[in-house]
């Protein structure tokens, strides 16, 4: 049974940022991720010669701390500026993309981190002043502290399955957090799209909310677009999937002026936080006798890539101070 200072459940951006900062602070750590890859919504897909960003399409940098990291990434070639202005833009500032794709950001941060993939946390249990976590593969890990960076409903599921009782005010904060869902279609086109430069379009009042041209973006050699839908979870759950896909594709073709030759899909159940917590992280064991238990992610004071990064950054400092 492995023993570490901090177990991090979830290897999205918040998780890997926190992991690296804790490792730099000389803490022993272990990250676990139920998926087959790290990065969460910093995701990409390749098929039939096309390359797609499937989740987050770009990011901005406004916090000075984050700007310093982005500057280093630009210098090292990990990210590039995609664009800063476009017709009808309400503000002019750089929008960055990963190079070659968004997932490289998480991979770059996670280079030295111990990460177990395809490992789902089932229960956490208190063992005196420490935690014992049980996993779907029958492994167990002992840790002084736990950080959960999954979407909050998944974190709550782990906590409830474990019969861990939180302070009522903390639980109320967590229960308030909600997410919107998104159906993503990655489509190969029969010719280059007519989406205006720089290769993205945001759409209101349609079944489609966003289209990115991955060829114009510079990540796909052949014409390929990523389509994000305007759907809530119940609309998706109750729909005939093939009919839904065709409706989304037909709508997107009106904007791309090109026909879809082939496509693949992905449903983002927790695409973007609708209701967020006001703080960068949640100290879930506060006002209890529980060992250190923290939650972080893009639902904490910032629903974007930058928010996820800063949440992981600051929660790592809080955990380090807690364990000192």
Locations of the language-model features?
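N-terminal Rossmann-like FAD-binding beta1-loop-alpha1 element of flavoenzymes
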Residues: 4-31, 316-320
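Active-site substrate-recognition segment that forms the wall
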Residues: 186-237, 247, 252-255
């Amino acid at each position: 049974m492995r023993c570490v200072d901090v177990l991090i459940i979830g290897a999205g951006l918040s998780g890997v940022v926190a992991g690296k900062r804790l490792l730099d602070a000389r803490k022993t750590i272990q990250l676990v991720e139920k998926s087959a890859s790290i990065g969460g919504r910093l995701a990409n897909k390749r098929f039939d010669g096309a390359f797609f960003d499937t989740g987050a399409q770009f990011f901005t940098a406004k916090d000075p701390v984050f700007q310093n990291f982005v500057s280093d990434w630009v210098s090292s070639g990990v990210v590039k500026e995609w664009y800063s202005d476009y017709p009808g833009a309400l503000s002019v500032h750089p929008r960055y993309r990963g190079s070659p794709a968004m997932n490289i950001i998480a991979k770059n941060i996670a280079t030295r981190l111990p990460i177990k993939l395809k490992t789902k946390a089932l229960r956490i249990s208190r063992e005196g002043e420490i935690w014992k976590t049980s996993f779907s593969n029958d492994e167990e890990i002992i840790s002084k502290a736990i950080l959960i960076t999954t979407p909050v409903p998944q974190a709550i599921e782990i906590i409830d399955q474990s019969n861990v009782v939180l302070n009522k005010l903390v639980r109320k904060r967590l229960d308030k957090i909600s997410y919107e869902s998104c159906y993503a279609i990655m489509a190969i086109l029969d010719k280059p799209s007519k989406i205006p430069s720089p290769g993205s379009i945001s759409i209101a009042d349609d079944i489609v909310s966003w289209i990115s041209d991955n060829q114009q973006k510079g990540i796909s050699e052949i014409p390929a677009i990523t389509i994000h839908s305007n759907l809530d979870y119940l609309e998706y759950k109750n729909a005939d999937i093939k009919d839904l896909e065709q409706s989304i594709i037909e709508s997107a073709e009106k904007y791309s002026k090109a026909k879809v030759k082939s496509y693949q899909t992905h449903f983002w159940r927790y695409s973007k936080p609708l209701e967020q917590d006001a703080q960068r992280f949640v100290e879930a064991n506060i006002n209890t006798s529980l060992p250190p238990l923290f939650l972080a992610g893009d639902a904490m004071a910032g629903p974007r890539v930058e928010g996820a990064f800063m949440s992981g950054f600051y929660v790592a400092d809080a955990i380090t101070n807690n364990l000192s």
